[in-house]
Regions:
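C-terminal beta-sandwich/jelly-roll accessory domains of carbohydrate-active enzymes
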Residues: 134, 145-175, 559-598
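Carbohydrate-binding surface patches
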Residues: 112, 537-578
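Noncatalytic carbohydrate-binding groove/subsite architecture in carbohydrate-active enzymes
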Residues: 324, 361-474
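Acidic-aromatic substrate-binding/catalytic surfaces of carbohydrate-active enzymes
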Residues: 35-94, 101, 220
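Substrate-binding cleft and catalytic face of glycoside hydrolase catalytic domains
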Residues: 202-206, 237-406
Length: 598
């Protein structure tokens, strides 16, 4: 149940300005730069006090109360612009013709100032609201009081005080997802700070699935910037799995051509060659490589490209079923050429996100048919490449894999189950993916790993500690719940880069690793060929994943602390372990190492 508190801040105005200040009672001990969590789409997700997140989520909303409403949120706006300058984070975004410019600035110890400018055409009959959402988990018993320019929310372990720059009238509503406030405010936040020990328990008696290690995507798009990022990542991370692009439309652009003959006669497209060389480099490092296709040639598209329009990044090409044999031969020719001329045998093949259509679209049954038919075609050529079941755009579209999952005739051609982690990774959904892989006795892969598919549009967010924390939280949860064979970062190139500087997304200074890089380096430092170890935490704010290679006596326990600073007490460590190395990554430390005797 969600309670909403709304304050009308704008109606038919050309320009409107209002201010917000967050006061934290002088008990803040974290660096100010880590105090306020601001998402790239403008939402504030709370303020940290001694590491404890005093949670509330702000949003901007435009529309009709109890009616049609547009709300700021992840991937809900068209290219919001995020920027940080010192202690100030700003976002510019537009909702229904109203342009909002929000600045969030840490002003002093425990003091955060928020200012919002709104620009609107006076002909628009729209009402805009500034909302604060309060979760049922921490505010189910909350008491809300308003008086003039002040609103207070008090629960058993939270207290929020909002001070406005003018008198306001609050409207309270009950909804199903949280609690929200629309304001021109100055909030004062405090709460119970939990420094108690986190008790971490390993279950060494029930080891789970193999974790090959962390992987990466290497779809080449930027010849100027990709090489330096790829080199840095491959030289400084243990990368255990790779995924590259099959540039199909460049491999055989003409229907009646012989692509192998063209290539052998010196006509191989440069981008095709670069993709093959990328795969060869990864194979030379000893890792399996997945081949995925985004863009089909025009001749293979049902109705031709002109009959399709790209909307929101999705074009959803249907392949021409009348040309199925030519399509299968064209793709198989690439696999044969890669083997004969580059020594590459691809482990698995997929059409990228064919549940959604980026860019080839399949129905669930077509996906099952493709796995069975193309899998048999490759087997007939003695090629070892298997199919990925799924390679879905999100965890949410699980049902897409059901026809193939329920058809035993497809199983011998499936090398792994795969989904992308952009959306929908709640515990229940993640468990469904893990169970699907177990049902047909194949590994689970996260074919594209990260949290926000639209983040390239506001790339400065990649350098934010909050983004880094959300990402590593997700990976740790996936490792614990799904026990995947690998998570393949999107990407280990300049696209969604783990590095900053030297012109990456226009950034200045030398090329350097971000906090995201160090988070992922810690996870990638898991011992090779380790098994997932079931692990539990006594604190819900501490996410854990554990791995062990019992043969070599090597173990790793990964802990992500979303709460206040606390001690971790680990039980279940094998008796033969006498010393632990502890690595810490945060806004200040980059895999800082200390040794702890057991």
């Amino acid at each position: 149940m969600t309670t909403f508190y709304r304050f009308d801040i704008m109606k038919n105005l050309r320009i409107f300005q209002f201010g917000i200040v967050v006061l934290l009672c002088g008990i803040l001990s974290l660096p100010l730069s880590a105090q306020t969590e601001v998402m790239a789409w403008s939402n504030i997700t709370g303020v940290r006090v001694d590491g404890e997140l005093i949670d509330f989520e702000s949003s901007l909303r435009v529309g009709t109360l109890k009616g049609d409403m547009e709300i700021t949120g992840k991937e809900k706006q068209v290219r919001p612009v995020f920027h940080r300058e010192g202690d100030m984070q700003e976002v510019t975004t537009t909702l229904r013709g109203i342009k909002f410019h929000q600045k969030v600035t840490d002003k002093g110890k425990g003091l955060v100032e928020i200012s919002i400018d709104a620009l609107s055409d006076t002909t628009l009959n729209q009402t805009a609201y500034y909302c604060i959402a309060l979760s049922p988990e921490n505010y189910v018993d909350a008491k809300v009081r308003t008086s003039g320019r002040k609103l207070t929310v008090t629960s058993a372990n939270r207290k929020l005080e909002f001070k406005f720059n003018k008198s306001v009238k609050a409207t309270v509503e009950k909804e199903s997802t949280g609690t929200v406030v629309y304001i021109s405010l100055m909030p004062h936040a405090s709460g119970v700070i939990d420094h108690s020990d986190a008790e971490i328990t390993l279950d060494m008696q029930n080891p789970g699935s193999l974790f090959a290690g962390f992987g990466g995507n290497f779809r080449l798009q930027n010849p100027a910037a990709d090489p330096k990022v790829i080199d840095y990542c491959l030289e400084n991370l243990r990368v255990a799995y790779g995924r590259v692009e099959f540039p199909w439309r460049l491999w055989q652009p003409e229907e009646e051509s012989d692509p192998i003959a063209v290539a052998q006669n010196g006509g191989l497209n440069k981008r095709v060659e670069e993709s093959l060389l990328m795969a060869k480099r990864l194979k030379a490092m000893g890792m399996p490589v997945i081949l995925s296709c985004w863009f089909p040639p025009a001749w293979a598209i049902d109705g031709g490209p002109a009959s399709y329009a790209r909307q929101g990044g999705v074009i959803a090409y249907r392949l021409d079923s009348r040309k199925k044999e030519k399509i299968y031969k064209s793709m198989a020719d690439y696999l044969l050429y890669a083997k004969q001329h580059y020594g590459i045998e691809f482990s698995m093949f997929s059409f990228n996100e064919s549940d959604l259509g980026i860019d080839v679209l399949h129905t669930p049954q077509e996906h099952a048919d493709f796995i069975q038919e193309f899998g048999a075609y490759l087997a007939g050529l003695n090629l070892p490449t298997r199919m990925l079941l799924g390679d879905n755009s999100d965890a949410t579209t699980f049902d897409f894999i059901l026809p193939a999952l329920n058809n035993p005739e497809t199983h011998k051609y499936i090398g792994a189950v795969s989904f992308h982690s952009w959306r929908g990774c709640d515990d229940v959904t993640l468990k469904k993916w893990a169970d699907a892989a177990k049902a047909i006795n194949v590994p689970l892969l996260v074919g594209e790993g990260s949290t926000d598919a639209a983040a390239h549009g506001y790339a400065e967010i990649f350098n934010e500690s909050t983004f880094a924390l959300y990402e590593i939280n997700l990976y740790t949860r996936i490792c614990a719940i799904c026990q995947p064979l690998s998570i393949l970062q999107w990407q280990l190139t300049s696209d969604y880069s783990l590095l900053w500087g030297d012109g990456i997304y226009g950034s200045k200074g030398p090329l350097r690793p971000t906090q995201r890089f160090w988070n992922i380096k810690q996870l990638a430092s898991t011992p090779a060929d380790a098994l997932a170890i079931p692990v539990s935490s006594s604190k819900k704010n501490v996410n854990c994943a554990a791995f062990g290679n019992m043969v070599r006596g090597e173990y790793a326990v990964h802990m992500v602390n979303n709460g206040a600073e606390c001690e971790a007490v680990i039980s279940g460590i094998p008796a033969e372990v006498k010393e632990l190395k502890v690595y810490v990554t945060n806004t200040k430390d980059c895999m800082k190492e200390t040794a702890v005797k057991v």
